[in-house]
Amino acid sequence: MKKKKALPSLLYLVFIVLLPWGVSFSFNKCLELWIKNWWNTRQSETLLTDIQEKRILERFIELEELSLLDEMIKEKLKTHVQKPPIGIHKQIIQLVKIDNEDHLHIILHFSTNIICLAILSGSFFLSKKELVIFNSWVQEFFYNLNDSIKAFFILLVTDFFVGFHSTRGWELVIRWVYNDLGWAPNELIFTIFVCSFPVILDTCLKFWVFFCLNRLSPSLVVIYHSISEA
């Protein structure tokens, strides 16, 4: 009976792990060309939006091109030339292309993540039977362990997610999420998340240990506290 449950459960676990990666890779390739054509067609209607102009000016400042802009303005006042110098014109075109690539990156990743989430949710809904088998197999595997090993695994998981060094890991996670979604980094949100989320998670784990696990196996709770206080 255990072997019959183990094989489908392991296959289901592999499926759940590989599905998001496969969907993300496939739709990235499929949607990239379509979104690029749509965005370029849309952008051809206008030269520069206010947001693009602001970003381009900021990048000029970063590239220390203010002196070139001043020269262009002085030259325009003297000669009333309507077109900017060729070098500045090329730089503007290059910055517009970079700005468009940033927008494409955000739209592509956001669309891919929405589709991936929808497919993953649909797979959970359509595979309720496999999910029940997997859940029962995990519970059976965990309950068959002796209390010392159970306490070790619980302590390992809690220290991994809410331990002293876990804040660095959560910071990497939130930065990866922002990068994957194509959002601009926000240090304030990163700090708030790293300071608050591990505390909330630690409270939930303690509640589970004291109130839920204590009812199922009081001896396990005693061993857990003995190991954690050692």
Curated annotation (Swiss-Prot):
Gene Ontology CC terms, in alphabetical order: chloroplast inner membrane
Pfam families associated with the record: CemA
Main location: plastid
Subcellular localization, as worded in the UniProt entry: Plastid, Chloroplast inner membrane
InterPro entries tied to this protein: CemA
Membrane topology reported for the UniProt record: Multi-pass membrane protein
Keyword list, A-Z: Antiport, Chloroplast, Hydrogen ion transport, Ion transport, Membrane, Plastid, Plastid inner membrane, Potassium, Potassium transport, Transmembrane, Transmembrane helix, Transport
Catalytic activity: K(+)(in) + H(+)(out) = K(+)(out) + H(+)(in)
Transmembrane segments: 7-27, 106-126, 145-165, 181-201
Signal peptide bounds: none
Molecular function terms, GO-annotated: antiporter activity; proton transmembrane transporter activity
GO BP: any one term: potassium ion transport
Domain of life (superkingdom): Eukaryota
Described purpose of this protein according to its UniProt entry: Contributes to K(+)/H(+) antiport activity by supporting proton efflux to control proton extrusion and homeostasis in chloroplasts in a light-dependent manner to modulate photosynthesis. Prevents excessive induction of non-photochemical quenching (NPQ) under continuous-light conditions. Indirectly promotes efficient inorganic carbon uptake into chloroplasts.
HAMAP family linked to this entry: CemA_PxcA (MF_01308)
PANTHER family: CHLOROPLAST ENVELOPE MEMBRANE PROTEIN (PTHR33650:SF2), CHLOROPLAST ENVELOPE MEMBRANE PROTEIN-RELATED (PTHR33650)
Family: Belongs to the CemA family.
Protein's recorded name: Potassium/proton antiporter CemA
The species this protein was found in: Agrostis stolonifera
Gene designation per UniProt: cemA
